[in-house]
Swiss-Prot record:
Compartment list: Cell membrane; Endoplasmic reticulum membrane; Golgi apparatus, trans-Golgi network; Endosome
Protein name: HLA class II histocompatibility antigen gamma chain
Gene for this chain: CD74
Sorted UniProt keywords: Adaptive immunity, Cell membrane, Chaperone, Disulfide bond, Endoplasmic reticulum, Endosome, Glycoprotein, Golgi apparatus, Immunity, Lysosome, Membrane, Phosphoprotein, Proteoglycan, Secreted, Signal-anchor, Transmembrane, Transmembrane helix
Pathology linked to this chain's protein: A chromosomal aberration involving CD74 is found in a non-small cell lung tumor. Results in the formation of a CD74-ROS1 chimeric protein.
Organism for this UniProt entry: Homo sapiens (Human)
Cysteine-cysteine disulfides: C213-C232, C243-C250, C252-C271
Region (Required for interaction with CTSL): 225-226
CC annotations in GO: cell surface; clathrin-coated endocytic vesicle membrane; cytoplasm; endocytic vesicle membrane; ER to Golgi transport vesicle membrane; external side of plasma membrane; extracellular exosome; Golgi membrane
Listed transmembrane segments: 47-72
Domain Thyroglobulin type-1, first and last residues per copy: 210-271
């Protein structure tokens, strides 16, 4: 009986134990079931993050490459714009330069009104300059030429030193005109530097001009047997008494070498009296007594 009771008790307890096992197994499986869906979700979020970061980096690199290409393409256009701007500036400077006057026939055909007489009130008022007072210097000729081309052109009075005049011109001229003037001065300086060498060459003294007496003496040697050699004073004029040593004849002459008539003879003469009687301007033997008294 006791065995039967114990067996029945075991059979009654068996379903209870099975239920407990099922509960334990279910409790163990519930956390695992809660964990299984979380693992793939975390993996998907990491993959999406990596993908988004790589796409962002790719877009940044592509943007930088596009910007560099755009700047490279625009560089050529900027160079063309710079060249065009420089050409326009040069053309503007060229238009500012003074132009030569047109022929009268062309001016009549193009603008006939310019040939009509203008009233005096319409002319610009300014300091009038006397265009007839010109010297023989280079600037005088240039001034005369410019006045003929444009009689109404007014030139500032430049009476200071050279640096002061340049400063005055820089302060009074317009910017474009001063730039043109600076360019001209630059080319003029290059021309002067190329024309003159840096080494100062010693300048030779100009040859001394010989008088008639000195020239005759230079052609005759000091020892001159049988030839006439005139005598000159310190100024190069002929001495009043000239002698031919080989034949012994002497005569009187004027300072220019003209012989006084009727003075040739042997021996020495007093040429001062002969020169007073003769007219030194002619040298042809005409005496002052023959000319008569000089009218007062």
């Amino acid at each position: 009986m006791h065995r039967r009771r114990s067996r029945s008790c075991r059979e009654d307890q068996k379903p209870v134990m099975d239920d407990q096992r099922d509960l334990i197994s279910n409790n163990e499986q519930l956390p695992m079931l809660g964990r299984r869906p979380g693992a793939p979700e975390s993996k998907c979020s990491r993959g999406a993050l990596y993908t988004g970061f790589s796409i962002l980096v790719t877009l940044l690199l592509a943007g930088q490459a596009t910007t560099a290409y755009f700047l490279y393409q625009q560089q050529g256009r900027l160079d063309k714009l710079t060249v065009t701007s420089q050409n326009l500036q040069l053309e503007n400077l060229r238009m500012k330069l003074p132009k030569p006057p047109k022929p009268v026939s062309k001016m009549r055909m193009a603008t006939p009104l310019l040939m009509q007489a203008l009233p005096m009130g319409a002319l610009p008022q300014g300091p009038m300059q006397n265009a007839t007072k010109y010297g023989n210097m280079t600037e005088d000729h240039v001034m005369h030429l410019l006045q003929n081309a444009d009689p109404l052109k007014v030139y500032p009075p430049l009476k200071g030193s050279f640096p002061e005049n340049l400063r005055h011109l820089k302060n009074t001229m317009e910017t474009i005109d001063w730039k043109v003037f600076e360019s001209w001065m630059h080319h003029w300086l290059l021309f002067e530097m190329s024309r003159h060498s840096l080494e100062q060459k010693p300048t030779d003294a100009p040859p001394k001009v010989l008088t008639k007496c000195q020239e005759e003496v230079s052609h005759i040697p000091a020892v001159h047997p049988g030839s006439f050699r005139p005598k000159c004073d310190e100024n190069g004029n002929y001495l009043p008494l000239q002698c031919y040593g080989s034949i012994g004849y002497c005569w009187c002459v004027f300072p220019n070498g003209t012989e006084v008539p009727n003075t040739r003879s042997r021996g020495h003469h007093n040429c001062s009296e002969s020169l007073e009687l003769e007219d030194p301007s002619s040298g042809l033997g005409v005496t002052k007594q023959d000319l008569g008294p000089v009218p007062m």
